UniProtKB/Swiss-Prot annotation:
Organism of derivation: Cereibacter sphaeroides (strain ATCC 17025 / ATH 2.4.3)
Keyword Metal-binding (UniProt): yes
Main localization (coarse): membrane
Function: Part of the Sec protein translocase complex. Interacts with the SecYEG preprotein conducting channel. Has a central role in coupling the hydrolysis of ATP to the transfer of proteins into and across the cell membrane, serving both as a receptor for the preprotein-SecB complex and as an ATP-driven molecular motor driving the stepwise translocation of polypeptide chains across the membrane.
Descriptive protein name: Protein translocase subunit SecA
Region called Disordered, residue ranges: 845-882
GO molecular function: ATP binding; metal ion binding; protein-exporting ATPase activity
UniProt xrefs under HAMAP family: SecA (MF_01382)
Keywords associated with the record: ATP-binding, Cell inner membrane, Cell membrane, Cytoplasm, Membrane, Metal-binding, Nucleotide-binding, Protein transport, Translocase, Translocation, Transport, Zinc
Binding site for ATP: Q90, G108, E109, G110, K111, T112, D503
Amino acid sequence: MLGLGTLARKIFGTPNDRKVKSVRSLVARINELETEFQALSDEGIKQKTAEFQRRVQEGGESLDDLLPEAFANCREGARRALGLRAFDVQLMGGIFLHQGNIAEMKTGEGKTLVATFPAYLNALAGKGVHVVTVNDYLAKRDSEWMGKVYAQLGLTTGVVYPFQSEEEKKAAYRADITYATNNELGFDYLRDNMKASKEEMKQRGHFFAIVDEVDSILIDEARTPLIISGPSQDRSDLYTKVDKLIPELVEEHYKLDEKTRNVTFTEEGNEFLETRLHETGLLPEGQSLYDPESTTIVHHVNQGLRAHKLFHRDQQYIVRNDEIMLIDEFTGRMMRGRRLSDGLHQAIEAKEGVSIQPENVTLASVTFQNYFRLYDKLGGMTGTAATEAEEFMEIYGLGVVEVPTNRPVARTDEHDAVYRTAREKNDGIVASIKEAHERGQPILVGTTSIDKSEALSELLKAAGIPHNVLNARQHEQEAQIVADAGKPGAVTIATNMAGRGTDIQLGGNVEMKVMQALAADPTAHPDEIRARIEAEHAEEKQKVIDAGGLFVLGTERHESRRIDNQLRGRSGRQGDPGRSAFFLSLEDDLMRIFGSDRLDKVLSTLGMKDGEAIVHPWVNKSLEKAQAKVEARNFDIRKQLLKFDDVMNDQRKAIFSQRLEIMEAEDLSDIAQDMRYQVIDDLIDMHMPPKSYSDQWDIEGMHRAVMDKLGLDAPLAKWAQEEGVDQDVVRERLCEAADRQIADKTAAFGPETMRSIEKQILLQAIDAKWREHLLTLEHLRSVVGFRGYAQRDPLSEYKTEAFALFESMLNSLRQDVTQKLAQVRPLSEEEQQAVMRQFLDQQRTAAEAPASVPQPQAAVAPQPAPELVGADNGESQPQAWGDVARNDPCPCGSGLKYKHCHGRLD
């Protein structure tokens, strides 16, 4: 008997069925227009684009109303440029993307072509469209390939990648459609908000983004902050000394939690550490680990412990050319230029004995969650999103629609085979691979880490089975290995989803074979080469089909069902036959850490002998329940982190918005004046409290503060003795005196120069104070969790204190700007030019430095913003400066190096 839910679905269809049905009329309308657009000349297609742009930008026609015509024009453009006619299901995918959904489309269904339809339609608005991919190779490949379609339609295409010149990057963002990686988009956003002028900014807004492999970017990497950072002091000797202590620890000294990937010292461990740190001199005698002064050394020791117990060579990182290269846990690729933050990368460098690079301090940061929520509209594509539908809707407001396949999926998904030990499992894997290889069936073997892929490779070598290994070490050969993976009998071992974004075609990749043949014999006729290779390919493809298609063999289950489904999805593309199976053992990480008692009972009920695998639907269900629990826990973590990050995000948006207004403004004298007046108000409130009498005022303290903050030697003691002088009178006189001082400086500098100095001082102060604020918030966030022990909500505490810190930062900003403007003095024209050049160069260096994405947090490299122009910070007392390095900024505040200023050798 059918359940009520099943019966209702049979009668009314699922919500997904209804969504698909709702766009069929639009697809029918596009098909009706096909002959009309086929009749157009090439020039006629471009004229249609120009007509559409006028209708949208000048006539106010909505993109929804224009959709059928625009899609019909795009389909014809793609047919002429690439020889590809989009299927109805591809049009559906394009419609769902335009509507701000995630289109779940299986591997091989042509997602790259699907993106051209909503990209073309939305580009007609003239605000730019970003197509987001997971790596630079795919961004360049797709922009070149689909750029032919956009050129046919009369639109421009750009591609953004690291280390481009300023002009190239700016031109790419000015194109109608821009291809880029999620990392580069996020970093350019941060860099733009560190620029000295609006003209230097590259991005022109966030109108519409289409995110390819959306699950990887918005779910897997959601917790990853993008951080641009600058160098701090070198502590490499401290890391080395701490690293020597870690191997002395025994198991009783620390507690390792593999579920949460966390490790902490026990009470015994703390006692042992304190003793050893005293003996090595790292902790002064009489000082305890629990003293506030010990915070730094305790932090270093904790990072050393994490480096040894949580980060393992050939799993989370590899060592190459005296460097620690991080491995992306989701794709298995090397992450060049990325560094772990908070001293963790240095701890791993000390552990491996490679050169220790200096730590970095955060200059700017944003998470992918908050970056992509900047867009007015967002769409996404992936082969697997349904399992995370709730998260996409709750965090990003994105619905998930499963788009029907053009042909039915012919892949057979077998039940998991569970062995008792890893050795028995590996024997089963090798036997299964050997049997498929001998039948001529290509096999893709999925592993979870580099060391496991290489261990399996050794087993296959011992068994005499030829194979390729695709992991971070073979990153450069990825395209070739993937192209060969569909050949008869090919065996390919891949870490996680390495090679994702490139289809494995049965019989091998025709285009790759043609290119290689033409490269080998440039004199050959391309048509003859293609005809010969296509004939050979058809024969090889048939052999593979007869052998059962691509066999995907998973060697472990992942924490997420979605990652497992991605691996399965490499087989059975476009209706091809295929087969998938997972081989597991009770020693696998997931089974060991999350395997429930229920699974143990199931296996004992079914009976298990040595060397024998259990294959049963009960096992699958039990595993999926364990995975669902892990997914729910990870979702909760991401949700909670987002709530914390939203606090910083609101502040970030306020600061970046204010900074942009300052960059755009011609005259900032009113803002500077408001800041001066606020500083005067604050000083009066502090030293001359309301409702107090003049004999209660702190005249001496007020005089010192006015000299320090405003540079004014005001006769406050005399004013206080005058009849009828109250706080309002003092305020008025100080404001007038401060205004006269600035007016005199404006006359000395010239109005234009003074306006430029005001802008420069404001931007520098905002950048410096924001950097300090980020560091303070990081520290607050690292300790606020302990408030839970006092029955206080950490999030509420964080919000309250972060707001108070933000207000404090704004007060400090006002004081800093007011003080610098009061102290600024006229420089010679030559000095002014030198200072301005140095400021702009350092701004550019800071904004264009290679940045990085961390594993909890990380980044690389720009210099901190320079000290300010011409501020008079006690120039009259060089004897009080102490020893100044010749390359350091001169303490007089000129902005010049000491050797070019007061340290000049005459």
